């Protein structure tokens, strides 16, 4: 199994694989070569420079590492390419097992804008905001004024708490909008963002679901 991630999640995956007697491959950027997950894995491959776009989000480099090590499965961990339908599809096409959802389902729910659209189509209430991604800063600012501050700028491909900016005042908007787009590109390889009304100290219900080929359970 090649672990397409770093840090704590990569360490936890490697530890689980060791318990099952499964060989592991760690990938790393040039500055992560001495990281714990690299030292723990059976093999390691450098996939690029310290910028995530050049390493942990670099699909061609990851595919080369898979081929080089004859890996037959990939665990994406969380963040990075874990919700990238294109990566999952490329693995499927190359008969490499992706330890995660299918590319079809990632495409439906991994992209926050698409997920929100599907929720609305199925009659679920959603938070007030843009209908899709906003590219033009003028359009985005106009919509934010209509919704009313504070607002939240969110990366379409974001996850794990990354890719979000809270804007409390109109004069802060342009700066945060630009930062949100550049961070979305840096961390998720996609600079598309959308806007939602921000709620201070909200409560939400989260359901954890574990699914295999033939059954699914909720916790």
Regions found by a protein language model. Give the residues of each.
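N-terminal beta-alpha lobe that positions the nucleotide/phosphoryl donor
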Residues: 1-219
């Amino acid at each position: 199994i090649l672990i397409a991630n770093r840090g704590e999640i990569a360490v936890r995956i490697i530890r689980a694989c060791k318990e099952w007697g499964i060989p592991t491959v760690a990938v790393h950027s040039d500055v992560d070569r001495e990281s714990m997950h690299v030292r723990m894995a059976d093999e390691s491959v450098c996939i690029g420079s310290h910028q995530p776009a050049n390493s942990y989000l670099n699909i061609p480099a990851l595919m080369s590492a898979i081929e080089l090590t004859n890996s037959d499965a990939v665990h994406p961990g969380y963040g990075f390419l874990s919700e990238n339908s294109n990566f999952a599809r490329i693995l499927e096409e190359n008969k490499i097992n992706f330890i995660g959802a299918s590319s079809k389902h990632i495409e439906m729910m991994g992209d926050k804008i698409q997920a929100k659209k599907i929720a609305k189509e199925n009659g679920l209430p959603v938070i007030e905001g843009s209908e899709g991604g906003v590219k033009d800063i003028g359009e985005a600012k106009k919509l934010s004024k209509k919704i009313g501050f504070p607002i939240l700028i969110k990366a379409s491909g974001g996850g794990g708490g990354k890719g979000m900016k809270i804007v409390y005042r109109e004069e802060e908007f342009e700066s945060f909008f630009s930062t949100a787009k550049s961070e979305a590109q840096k961390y998720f390889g996609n600079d598309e963002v959308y806007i939602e009304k921000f709620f201070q100290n909200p409560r939400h219900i989260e359901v954890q679901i574990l699914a295999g080929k033939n059954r699914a359970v909720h916790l």
